[in-house]
């Protein structure tokens, strides 16, 4: 294989690839045929031929690739792209045959962490992409034996908390239709997280209801579905009943004193009676929601 090597010096290069310095020497950039590139296994991020890609292609035609990608050699031949999938696609569309890259030997876990961290801060990432990426990085860090709070460590590159990372990873438990609904904002992320605790079959019932009735699932409804599922009480008719409930306009409700007087000691004043009523209503509400 013929490789044309060229050392490229870029301003701020060390800031972009902090670990590209080995033994005090700059890592060498090589130009490789893009025909030898392979997509990262289970790559979670889209590479779309959209308006932004058109802008990237124009830049590549005018200036070339200013920031090298990162690849690793494969035992089967060729190179797996770790960072630079969009640049690779832009090269294809621009008619370029080669692309500047850093070639590194690294483990699957190391490659996964770099792949996620170099993509996670993009502005146009879908919830499903971030969910899959965070899960991949979390699993990689577990295999590496990383110490400390892993969820927090996973979110560091994107400036997100460990709790937020957990919520995203939960979304990977959704069936494809519901995950797509989260991406398209038909279902909120908060609702999607709660629905992720339902079984695949139960999620199918939910999707059928959303698809046929165009219902907007509220957080309280999702919480109720989750609670019923946990107790093994959820079935198709109940899903429909929970999701199809509509808020009714209520007028003022007045209960005559004579109707409730016999239920309270004669010594109870109005405030004490109201407190008991509110407590009982709250307990009733929780039973209705299956909490």
Predicted regions and their residues:
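Short, charged/polar connector segments at secondary-structure boundaries
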Residues: 1-104, 115-121
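Amphipathic alpha-helical extensions and coiled-coil-like segments
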Residues: 33, 132-139, 162-279
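Amphipathic, charge-rich alpha-helical segments that serve as recognition/docking helices
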Residues: 45, 89-174, 197
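Short polybasic/polar patches that bind polyanions
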Residues: 61, 92, 156, 182-183
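Charged, low-complexity intrinsically disordered regulatory/assembly segments
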Residues: 286-291
């Amino acid at each position: 294989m013929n490789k044309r090597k060229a050392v490229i010096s870029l301003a701020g290069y060390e800031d972009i690839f902090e670990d590209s310095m080995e033994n005090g020497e700059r890592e060498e950039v090589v130009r490789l045929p893009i025909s030898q590139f392979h997509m990262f296994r289970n790559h979670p991020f889209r590479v779309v031929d959209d308006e932004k890609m058109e802008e990237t292609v124009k830049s590549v035609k005018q200036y070339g690739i200013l920031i090298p990608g990162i690849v690793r050699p494969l035992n089967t031949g060729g190179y797996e792209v770790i960072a630079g999938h969009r640049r690779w696609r832009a090269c294809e569309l621009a008619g370029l045959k080669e692309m500047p890259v850093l070639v590194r030997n690294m483990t699957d876990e190391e490659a996964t962490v770099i792949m996620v961290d170099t993509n996670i801060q993009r502005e146009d990432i879908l919830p499903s992409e971030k969910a899959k990426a965070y899960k991949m990085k979390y699993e990689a860090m577990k295999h590496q034996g990383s110490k400390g709070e892993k969820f927090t460590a996973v979110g560091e590159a994107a400036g997100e908390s460990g709790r937020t990372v957990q919520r995203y990873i939960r979304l990977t438990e959704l069936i494809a239709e519901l995950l797509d609904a989260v991406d398209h904002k038909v279902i909120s992320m908060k609702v999607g997280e709660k629905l992720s605790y339902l079984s695949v079959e139960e999620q199918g019932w939910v999707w059928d209801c959303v698809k046929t009735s165009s219902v907007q699932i509220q957080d309280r409804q999702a919480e109720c579905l989750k609670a019923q599922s946990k107790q093994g009480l959820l079935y198709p008719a109940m899903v429909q009943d929970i999701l199809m409930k509509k808020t009714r306009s209520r007028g003022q409700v007045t209960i005559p004193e004579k109707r409730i007087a016999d239920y309270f000691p004669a010594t109870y004043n109005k405030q004490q009676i109201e407190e008991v009523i509110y407590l009982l209503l709250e307990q009733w509400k929780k039973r209705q929601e299956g909490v």
